[in-house]
């Protein structure tokens, strides 16, 4: 008998995730290097226009006739390729029992993702559960506002090169206070170090380390 869930989260590598709702809606977040034959998408969301987050070839593989492609207003020109819908940061998009909100995501110290680009983090909500995909970001003040949003699962970059290292990423988790934190965009680092750090900083936050294409997390 399969486990019941409101959201099922599967890591596809890099910053790419497949999220399914309990009602069978299939959402892809930042799909990249997607294999042929993967399950088609109801909704695809890209956090920003860098090729490893808005990957046209992967998006095309996941498209069906009624797939909806979403992203922040700042990548409207990219979205046109798929007749996509831009969303203003802070606004939400509702689809059946699903709510999608885009919030700021940017670098503070590094030059790769400036705040002025108005790129996005993504919050998906369904059935009283939520998943936050931080996009390519560093620790930013807006994250502290997420502590009031009761995030179930936070997907946090920790590769260090273009985003955060383990120390900063775990600080973000402490700011956000999700029930579960999942490290991503990790560039083959030992993710157990992320787990050890966060367990010391806030043992109330559970760390789940997903395997690429492995068993998904059900919440």
Predicted features and spans:
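Core dinuclear metal-dependent hydrolase active-site scaffold
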Residues: 1-39, 85-148, 211-219
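Short active-site oxyanion
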Residues: 7-8, 63-68, 129-131, 179-181
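Binuclear metal-ion centers of metallo-dependent hydrolases, dominated by the metallo-beta-lactamase
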Residues: 8-9, 83-95, 170, 174-219
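Divalent metal-coordination and catalytic microenvironments
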Residues: 19, 48, 100, 136, ...
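Active-site metal-binding motif and surrounding structural segment of the metallo-beta-lactamase
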Residues: 28, 32-77, 148-155
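Active-site environment of divalent metal-dependent phosphoester hydrolases
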Residues: 35-36, 50-54, 76-79, 91-94, ...
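A short acidic, amphipathic alpha-helical/loop segment
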Residues: 57-62, 78, 142-146, 168-172, ...
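Metallo-beta-lactamase
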Residues: 123-176, 183-190
């Amino acid at each position: 008998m399969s486990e019941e869930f409101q959201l099922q989260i599967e890591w596809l590598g890099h910053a790419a995730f497949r999220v399914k709702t309990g009602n069978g809606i299939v959402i892809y977040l930042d799909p990249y290097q997607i294999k042929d034959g993967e399950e088609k998408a109801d909704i695809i969301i890209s956090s920003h226009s860098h090729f490893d987050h808005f990957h046209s070839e992967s998006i095309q593989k996941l498209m069906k006739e009624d797939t909806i492609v979403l992203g922040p207003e700042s990548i409207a020109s990219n979205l046109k390729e798929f007749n996509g819908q831009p969303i203003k940061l802070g606004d939400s998009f509702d689809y059946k029992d699903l709510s999608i909100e885009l919030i700021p995501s940017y670098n503070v110290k590094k030059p790769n993702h400036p705040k002025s680009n108005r790129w996005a983090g993504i919050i998906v909500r369904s059935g009283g559960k939520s998943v936050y995909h931080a996009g390519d970001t560093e620790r930013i003040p807006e994250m502290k506002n997420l502590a009031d949003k009761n995030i179930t699962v936070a997907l946090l970059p920790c590769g260090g090169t273009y985003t955060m290292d383990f120390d900063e990423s775990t600080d973000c988790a402490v700011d956000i206070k999700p029930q579960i934190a999942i490290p991503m965009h990790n560039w083959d680092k030992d993710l157990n170090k992320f787990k050890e750090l966060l367990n010391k900083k806030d043992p109330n936050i559970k760390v789940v380390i997903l395997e690429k294409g492995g068993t998904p997390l059900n919440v």
